Design a protein with these regions (language model features):
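Conserved alpha/beta core of the MobA/IspD/sugar-nucleotide pyrophosphorylase nucleotidyltransferase superfamily
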Residues: 171-226
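N-terminal nucleotide-binding beta1-loop-alpha1 segment
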Residues: 1-25
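A short, N-terminal amphipathic alpha-helix
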Residues: 38-55
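Short beta-strand/loop segment that forms part of the nucleotide-sugar
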Residues: 55-64
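Short, glycine-/small-residue-rich phosphate/pyrophosphate-handling segment
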Residues: 155-176
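Conserved donor-nucleotide/metal-binding helix-loop-beta segment in metal-dependent transferases, i.e.
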Residues: 117-143
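Short phosphate-binding loop-to-helix
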Residues: 71-108, 169
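Short aromatic-hydrophobic micro-motifs that form the base-stacking/packing surface
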Residues: 110-112
Length: 226
């Protein structure tokens, strides 16, 4: 039986800093609340990443001032290799992280962010399995981007010529893959937590066992009772 290639799970995260995280939630929440929401999301994603089997290495790639972290986040990040994001835009930062992990011997690299704290862990497992037969896998998000990208070899094409943060990220990426004849697999869609209505949706449809830290926080926020 053929042995599976070594696999790495990468979490992309911004260090929790007041006024710099989850700013679009500011329509409804204070800066302190936005910070608390982000920290809860980060905790949930770290627990998610720790729970998915099949990975030989787990990494946390930080942006921002990660030198000083809240104690609970510092503790939760201990099982991960802590690294720094490098690059002028998100595409270059993801490419550089993948390049680093492939150089260290990984044969499959999966990258997730912190915007989908209730993502079912099996989605990440599906991505890992898909990379046994295709060079690239994407998890589409409802806002036109993607919540996950994975690759079984280093490539630049998916990370160039994309307007990051726009609603055209996924469509442009698929166009690039087709133009360059790069095979890929699409996972089932999911949603990001970017705006207040996304939090209301999550609170109303919380799947059992998902996003426990965020669920606990939302139950304490008076704004949800208004």
């Amino acid at each position: 039986m053929m042995a599976h290639s070594p696999a790495t799970l990468v979490v992309f995260a911004r260090a929790p800093e007041k006024g710099l995280v989850k700013t679009r939630l500011g329509e409804r929440f204070s800066e302190d609340q936005c910070l608390a929401i982000y920290e809860a999301m980060l905790m949930d994603v770290l627990e998610l990443a720790s729970s998915v089997p099949g990975f030989d290495r787990r990494c946390l790639y930080w942006a921002g001032a990660s030198e000083v972290l809240p104690s609970r986040i510092r503790e939760a990040s201990q099982p991960f290799h802590n690294c720094r994001q490098a690059g002028q835009d998100l595409g270059l930062r993801m490419h550089n992280a993948m390049r680093e992990e492939f150089a260290l011997g990984s044969g499959r690299v999966v990258v997730i962010g912190c915007d989908s704290p209730d993502l079912p862990p099996e989605r990440v497992g599906q991505a890992l399995h898909a990379l046994e037969s295709v060079p690239l896998v994407l998890g589409p998000s409802e806002d036109g981007g993607y919540y996950l990208i994975g690759a079984s070899r280093l490539m630049r094409e998916p990370f160039e010529g994309v307007q990051w943060g726009s609603s055209s990220v996924l469509a442009k990426t698929l166009e690039i893959l087709g133009k360059n004849e790069i095979g890929f697999s699409l996972l089932p869609g999911w949603y990001d937590i970017d705006r207040p209505e996304d939090l209301y949706r999550l609170k109303a449809s919380m799947r059992p066992g998902g996003a426990g830290h965020l669920r606990g926080l939302l139950s304490t926020l008076r704004v949800f009772a208004s």
